[in-house]
Regions:
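Alpha-helical transmembrane bundles and membrane-interface segments of multipass inner-membrane proteins
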Residues: 1-181
Length: 181
């Protein structure tokens, strides 16, 4: 397994540890004190592996079908688990998370149908923008510092817009997948 794929797997493996840190109560409150900052550190490190795996894979021609498939899946695991934890902590509206996760199911469905035909659909430019904004938004929501409340809300709306734009982009670019159904 090459280095970019190892980084992708490392990101996926970090998810259960991250979720545990998000939900461990400290003095009766989840995601506070050392747990909050450790969860944020784990999330940032995991998010940085997303940046690194792609850069390394492109620079050294280490792009694989495994990476094309698993990289977006590891992103989904990390971001969706974080969003679900944030709903539990009442830091993000549930409807926003439902829209984001619904988009992930739609795109995953398109990828699975395409994979059945031997086609691997890599992440799009809009999908990458969406992931970056979602990860930044999640980081601010984990930190939960009142001074960033307005910025966090702006990031949420941008991430939501990019979620919908990227979904439409994937559907339009892969309309041929639907024609085979």
């Amino acid at each position: 397994m090459n280095l970019p794929n190892r980084l992708t797997v490392m990101r996926a493996v970090a998810v259960p540890f991250f979720v545990a840190l998000m939900l461990i109560p400290v003095n009766g409150v989840a995601c506070e004190g050392w747990c909050k900052w450790t969860a944020l550190a784990v999330f940032i490190i995991a998010a940085l592996t997303d940046l690194l795996d792609g850069k390394i894979a492109r620079r050294y021609q280490l792009i694989t079908n495994f990476g094309k498939f698993m990289d977006p899946l590891a992103d989904k695991l990390l971001v969706c688990s974080a969003l679900i934890c944030l709903v539990e902590l009442e830091r993000i509206p549930a409807w926003v998370v439902i829209v984001i996760i619904a988009r992930e199911f739609v795109i995953s469905g398109i990828r699975l149908v395409a994979a059945d035909d031997g086609v691997v659909i890599a992440a799009s430019k809009w999908g990458k923008f969406k992931t970056v904004f979602q990860m930044i938004m999640v980081g601010f929501m984990i930190g939960n510092l009142p001074v960033f409340d307005i910025l966090t809300q702006i990031l949420m709306w941008i991430a939501l817009a990019l979620t919908l734009i990227s979904m439409v982009d994937y559907i339009v670019k892969n309309i041929n997948v639907f024609k085979k159904l």
